[in-house]
UniProtKB/Swiss-Prot annotation:
GO biological process: nucleobase-containing small molecule interconversion; pyrimidine nucleotide metabolic process
Family assignment from sequence similarity: Belongs to the cytidylate kinase family. Type 1 subfamily.
Source organism of this protein record: Flavobacterium johnsoniae (strain ATCC 17061 / DSM 2064 / JCM 8514 / BCRC 14874 / CCUG 350202 / NBRC 14942 / NCIMB 11054 / UW101) (Cytophaga johnsonae)
Annotated ATP binding sites: G10, F11, S12, S13, T14, G15, K16, S17, T18
Protein name: Cytidylate kinase
Listed GO MF terms: ATP binding; CMP kinase activity; dCMP kinase activity
Keywords: ATP-binding, Cytoplasm, Kinase, Nucleotide-binding, Transferase
Gene: cmk
Amino acid sequence: MKKITIAIDGFSSTGKSTLAKQLAKELEYVYVDTGAMYRAVAYFAMQNKFIGADFFNKEALIEALPKIQLEFKFNSDLGFAEMYLNGENVEKQIRTIEVSNFVSKVAEVSEVRSKLVEQQQEMGTNKAIVMDGRDIGTVVFPNAELKIFMTASAETRAQRRFDELQQKGDNVSYEDVLKNVVERDYIDTHREDSPLVIADDAIEIDNSYLNKEEQFAAVLELVNDVVKID
């Protein structure tokens, strides 16, 4: 069976990671959550007081980039790889609303994107990989054999994210989550370096009214068309 690169891009909280994990498991491919990488850098910036509600010391973050070591380590109990920042498991810490509030601002920094894109491209050298993010099909793997672009209404995405955070025990309001989603959309689509856009050869999926099973079945069919699975 031909091994391919699958690029999944789209807006925040569209279920990119969930779909990518499902595909990687089904195909026995490597899964890389690039959003976790940017979240880890944002968390690092927060911990080192480089960014806050009303300030962002980009120069300090850029200077500290060589000190940031990111690594995915597979957790057999959970069935997926967790993010490690300088040797520490930060999978839980990077999923908070606080990190969500800053991740798009950190991802705007060209030096951050350059460092992470290079690392992501190295991960995909041997294909057989599913990678999700904002610029996978346009920048990281412009020659990917299959490109998916996922979208849904801001309200639908905010509700999904709110429900997820509630299940984790995070005390947040729907209004705050919706505000975060809208702000991230604007920053992601308006940044100068690698803005969020749909690749010319990507297949767009609006999953506002699709459940996970319907979405997975549709995308798996697309994969089968590309790799010619009988």
